[in-house]
Structures are given as C-alpha cells and as structure tokens.
C-alpha cells in the first residue's frame, strides 16, 4: 500500500519549477520560433517580422493590460483586428501561447531525454523510430492476432477550461504561472473557440494548435495514468516495448483522489482488471483497448471508464462512446487503414500407416487493407477524379511547366505507395496509381490543348516514368536477386519508420 500512495503522490523533484520568470525572456520566443521552423507548423511563421516587434517590454505591457482590463474582448464590428500596441491583438496572443507552450514543455523534454537515454544504453530501440506513425502497426501485428475483444473508445474532451489548468497543477508549483494560464485561457475563449466538436472526435482551432495540443495531451495522460497503473500492478510481466511506447507520450500527472479508493478496497478493484493480455493504443482522439478476456471482462472495463471520467473529471460521458467489438467480426478505420483480424483457413493432410486424415486448421491473421472509397473521395475532393473514380485534369496546375506537373503528381503517388506499403493487398494502390497517372496526362494535354492520345504519341510514354513508385525502387535494390519476380514481395507488408505526418492531398507542393 505504501507503493500505491507513493505512486499517487506528486513528485517532490517537480516542486521548484518556477516558470513565470521565463515568460519575460526574449530568447524563449526566439527558440519557440526556431522550433516551429523545424516542425514547419508554427503560427509565428505567418508573421516573420514579429522579432522586430516583440521584446521584454511589450510582453510585460501585454500581460499587465490583460490583468487590468479586458483587452482581449473583441467587438462584433471588428472581430479580426483591434489596435493594441499598434499591432494585431490576436498575433500577440499567439506569441504568448507559443512561448508558454515552449516553456511548459521544458520539464517534460528533460524527463523524456533522461528516460530515453536509459533505454538507449540497453540498445532496445531508437527513440526517433517511435515517432513514426507506422511504429504502431508492428505492435498490433504481433499482438492483436491473439486477442478476442476490443473496446473502441472515443476519448471525451474537457468541456471546461478549468480541467485543462488542473492537469498541470501537480508540477507547475508557482501560482503566478497557473494564474496567468487560467486568465489567458478564459480571455482567449472570447476570441476563438478552443475546441470545435463538428466531427465525432475532437479538433482544435487552427490558431495556437501547439499550445492546446499540449494541454490536451496532459489531460489525456491523466486519464491514462490510472489505466497504466492498474495494468502494471495486475501483471508481473512488464513488456519492455510497452514501456518504451509509454515514454513516447509520457506526461507527468497524479491522481490524489484515488488514494482513498485503493486504500479501502484495492485488492477487489485490482481483481476486476487482472488480465495479462491487455493492450492499449491511442490515436487521433480515439483509443482501443484489446484483451484476450471474455465479454464480461470488457463490459466491466467499459463501465469503469465511464464512471472514472464522470466522477474524476465531471464529464457527461455516455456509454455510447465506448463500443465492445469482437476482433474476428469487426473491421475498424485505424490510421488510414481498414484493419481486422481474420481467420486464414489451411488444410493439412496427415498420413498414419494406412489411414490418412484431413485436418482443418484456422490461423488468426492481422489484416490491413487500403480503404478505396475514402481514398477516392479524397482524390475527388482534391480535383484529381470524380466521385466515381474517373480521372479528370487539374486545371489549377496547367500553368506550371511539364516537369513540375509530373513531379507533383509523382510525389503524391509515391507518398501514397510509401504510406500504404503495409497493405495486405496492393491492387487498390495500383488503381489509385492509374487515376493519378491518367489525371496527370489529361492535365498535360489540357495545357498543350490536345487530346491525351495525341499528347502521349507526340511526347512518348517515357514522359510518365516518374510514376515508378519509391516502393518498387526500394524493393528492386533490397532484393536484387528477386528483381525478375517481385510479385511475392509486393504482397508482403512493409512498415517504414520515417513517416511522421500525413499531409492533405490538396496541399502537396
């Protein structure tokens, strides 16, 4: 019981992290700007001249005026710009949020680096490989084929801003930082909607995404910390890879309210969740909880999670946001793939003396397919084809040079083949390749004011050799002996550890 209470106590080493003075340091905002340059998603990139405007004095005046009066309240007549120190008011709110996000990430980054260095000493994994989207699929491929049921969970988002502030109260000990964060969030709420709920999951407003994603991740970690604690306590077999994946999304947070619960009836509570084959994965505002247990056990987990979110976070969380599905009878949209566990039947003939037997053996296999209908819908939205999949020209690219047009189409095709290299069946990818190739030909023909047949006859079919996918090139170099018959290799799944994001088709440059 002492170990449980020690786990739930706030870390004493974090009690002297005074972050408020760092807000007034100019180099913090410069580092945040450089960090955004590296990640290519900083709000400050839209305002490259801010370095000449931002200074210690401006930040101090801005925070002072925030406390003195409601300078962030925007009238209905002028919802975009107001005169505030001669600049856009929204721009300065974004600057402070970028700087504050960079500051609060410092303790987490130091803790993550120390944990990764301890793992790297054992040469278990490379930390940058865990950043790849494909790093999750080998884990699912190795474990999900042995499981029976899965909980599909739609993670609730905090509807109250105070919940976001309280997730950081255990390690941010200076009251000034918490007060500034609380005040800034409530004032920013009047400017823009922090979270929009148009989609079934969650989505943040385009401004200040890094700041609010940090708050959201810290909130989600507090939700997950109890589950991870119960999972580790109920099983004596701790997987090293599981611990590595946990460090990837590690955020410090403790739950004091559960101390009394564990102290009173911890053994009974622990017995309900004792399952050594429990696996958890979070992605895109959703999470899945898979187990080898029975339907009754998964139903207990479902009601436990509902009660936990309702009691601890005061959220109105309904049971309809959690669905129990059997892996063998259910396919799910997971990170752009249609993943499922299907039975692969195999017939074995056994000969014993004069008698022979036919043994039907079914093996579970984790299957990943390319969702053709959503993918064609994305191509149609980007004006590469119709909703039925018929290729059309791209008029907005007809003013470019021939090499640029071919390069853009080829880059999209190669990226799609690269991301969907883990598909069990590549036939869908070759259909997408056909759509993009013919769309490219029609775009070039439109530019030269001729038909596709006439253009290809005049230019030669070698003009579209750009569509030799990167997967085919890599496989031909990796397996030179099998270059003549790579059909068996094409059917195998290949997961790459260099895919860090998924871009919209319309934004490919």
Curated annotation (Swiss-Prot):
Any one of the GO CC terms: chloroplast
Segments traversing the membrane: none
Localization, UniProt: Plastid, Chloroplast
Domain of life: Eukaryota
Signal peptide range in chain numbering: none
Keywords: Chloroplast, mRNA processing, Plastid, RNA-binding, tRNA processing
Major subcellular location class: plastid
InterPro entries: Domain_X, Maturase_MatK, Maturase_MatK_N
Biological process terms in GO annotation: mRNA processing; RNA splicing; tRNA processing
Pfam entry (one): MatK_N
UniProt-listed HAMAP family: MatK
Function of the protein: Usually encoded in the trnK tRNA gene intron. Probably assists in splicing its own and other chloroplast group II introns.
Family, similarity comment: Belongs to the intron maturase 2 family. MatK subfamily.
Protein name: Maturase K
Organism classification: Eukaryota, Viridiplantae, Streptophyta, Embryophyta, Tracheophyta
């Amino acid at each position: 019981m002492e170990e449980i209470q020690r786990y739930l106590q706030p870390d004493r080493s974090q009690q002297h992290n005074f972050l408020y003075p760092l807000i007034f340091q100019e180099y913090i905002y410069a580092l945040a700007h450089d960090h955004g340059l590296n990640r290519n998603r900083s709000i400050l990139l839209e305002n490259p001249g801010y370095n000449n405007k931002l200074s210690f004095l401006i930040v101090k005046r801005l925070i002072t005026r925030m406390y003195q009066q409601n300078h962030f309240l925007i009238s209905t007549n002028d919802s975009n710009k107001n005169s505030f120190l001669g600049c856009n008011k929204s721009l300065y709110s974004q600057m402070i949020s970028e700087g504050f996000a960079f500051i609060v990430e410092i303790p987490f980054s130091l803790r993550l680096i120390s944990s990764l260095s301890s793992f790297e000493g054992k040469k278990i994994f490379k930390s940058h490989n865990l950043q790849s989207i494909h790093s999750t699929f080998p884990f699912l491929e190795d474990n999900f084929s042995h499981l029976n049921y899965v909980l599909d969970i739609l993670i609730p988002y905090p509807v109250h801003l105070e919940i976001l502030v309280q997730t950081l109260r255990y390690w941010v000990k200076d009251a000034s930082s918490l007060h500034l964060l609380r005040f800034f969030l409530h004032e920013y709420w009047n400017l823009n909607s922090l979270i929009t709920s148009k989609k079934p999951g969650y989505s943040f407003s385009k401004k200040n995404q890094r700041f609010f994603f940090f708050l959201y991740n810290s909130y989600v970690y507090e939700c997950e910390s109890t589950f991870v604690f119960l999972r580790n306590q109920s099983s004596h077999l701790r997987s090293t890879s599981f611990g590595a994946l946990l460090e990837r999304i590690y955020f410090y947070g403790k739950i004091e309210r559960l101390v009394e619960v564990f102290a009173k009836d911890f053994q009974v509570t622990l017995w309900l969740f004792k399952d050594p084959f429990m696996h958890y994965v979070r992605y895109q505002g959703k999470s899945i909880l898979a187990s080898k247990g029975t339907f009754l056990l998964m139903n207990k987990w479902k009601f436990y999670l509902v009660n936990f979110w309702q009691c601890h976070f005061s959220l109105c969380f309904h049971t309809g946001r959690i669905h129990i599905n059997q892996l063998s009878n259910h396919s799910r949209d997971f990170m752009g793939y249609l993943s499922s566990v299907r039975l692969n039947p195999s017939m074995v003939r056994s000969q014993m003396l004069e008698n022979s037997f036919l043994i039907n053996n079914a093996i579970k296999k984790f299957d990943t397919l390319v969702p053709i209908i959503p993918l064609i819908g994305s191509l149609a939205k980007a004006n590469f084809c119709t909703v039925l999949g018929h290729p059309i020209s791209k008029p907005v690219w007809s003013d470019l040079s021939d090499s640029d047009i071919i390069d853009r189409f080829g880059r999209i095709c190669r990226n799609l083949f690269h991301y969907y290299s883990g598909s069990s069946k590549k036939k869908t990818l070759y259909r997408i390749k056909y759509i993009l190739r013919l769309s490219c030909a029609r775009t070039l023909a439109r530019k030269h004011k001729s038909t596709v047949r006439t253009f290809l006859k005049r230019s030669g079919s070698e003009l579209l050799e750009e569509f030799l996918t990167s997967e085919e090139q890599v496989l031909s170099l990796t397996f030179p002996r099998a270059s003549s018959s790579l059909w068996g290799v094409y059917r195998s799944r290949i997961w790459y550890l260099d895919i860090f994001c998924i871009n919209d088709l319309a934004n490919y440059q």
